Amino acid sequence: MKKFLVFILLILSANTYAQSGNESLIRQRLKQQTESWNRGDIEGFMETYWKNDSLLFIGNSGVNRGWQNTLNNYRKGYPDTAAMGKLSFDIIMVKKLSSKYYYVVGKWMLTRSIGNLSGHYDLLFKKIKGRWYIIADHSS
């Protein structure tokens, strides 16, 4: 009986580690996003997004599809480093939906000399070829 209990505890702890490991990887991807943004590197910022025509982005201008369209919209909305400012995220929740999907809710803040901006976001991450990518973004 003791061996069985030890076995169950090992399985449960391994599952917890895997969950926290994936959450840590997703948090790292978001950290990479802010670092790229704060260097003025929109293309680097976009590396966290799924480079696919099915990427879904919902923002102030409505529903947009596709990685290239999303990149173009970011370039149009943030043409220089003054407009980009410094980005920070406050991650409110990271929730595992399955072994391949995580849901993230948070707040974004832009500190800028031309006026600060802030809002909330929810993201759907999918594990694709061993890496976590944003496949849907709703930012307001």
Regions found by a protein language model. Name each.
Residues F4, I8-T48, N69:
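Short, low-complexity N-terminal intrinsically disordered segments enriched in polar/charged residues
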Residues Q33, F45-M46, S54-L55, T70, ...:
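Hydrophobic pocket/interface hotspot
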Residues K51, L97-S98, I128:
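Structural motif
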Residues N69-I114:
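Surface-exposed, charged secondary-structure patches
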Residues W50, S61, M93, K107-W108, ...:
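A mature extracytoplasmic/lumenal domain signature
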Residues S54-R65, P79-A82:
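A short gly/proline-enriched turn/hairpin at secondary-structure junctions
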Residues S118-S140:
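Short beta-strand edge/turn micro-motifs at domain boundaries
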